Amino acid sequence: MPAIRIVHRSSLAPAEAWKRLTDWERHGAQVPLTRTIIETAPPTHVGTVFTARTGVGRITFDDPMEVVVWRPPAAASRGASSGLVRLVKRGRTVRGWAEIEVRPLPAGGTEIHWREELRLRGLGRAFDPLVAAAGRFLFGRALARLLRP
């Protein structure tokens, strides 16, 4: 599976960065031709399921995901801490996992680590470098937009 690793720094506090990065509906708005369908009642928790549906018209594919780790950062009033969410991709077309981790920076702000490994059905390992490059571009752009003031 191609590995996608993105590190991004933000002036936002960890709790605010977390709030923005785990707003699943906003994720769909950042990826071209994609919308997110939340299938579990809020708030997000272990077991939450949602699907990113990408496509045009009747030509679409679904990327169903389940939250398997949900550890939000502590509120700033209790001393900022790291947060981690892990998603497992359970679709027919897209398989793998993704993690988003927020870490407080000593001088304020947050360092975000986005890690993802995915396999696209029908694409052999020869396409891994292309899939990884496209993923870094798309997810990096989505990350920056989600954190934008």
Labelled PLM ranges:
Residues 117-149:
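A conserved amphipathic terminal alpha-helix motif
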Residues 36-40, 49, 131-134:
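Juxtamembrane/interface motifs at transmembrane-helix termini
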Residues 12, 45, 62, 137-141:
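Generic recognition of short, well-ordered alpha-helical interface segments
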Residues 1-45:
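Hydrophobic ligand-binding cavity/cleft-lining segments
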Residues 4, 36-38, 51, 84, ...:
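Short structured motifs
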Residues 17-21, 27, 50, 67, ...:
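Hydrophobic pocket/interface hotspot
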Residues 43, 55-111, 117-120, 148:
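Hydrophobic-ligand binding "helix-grip"
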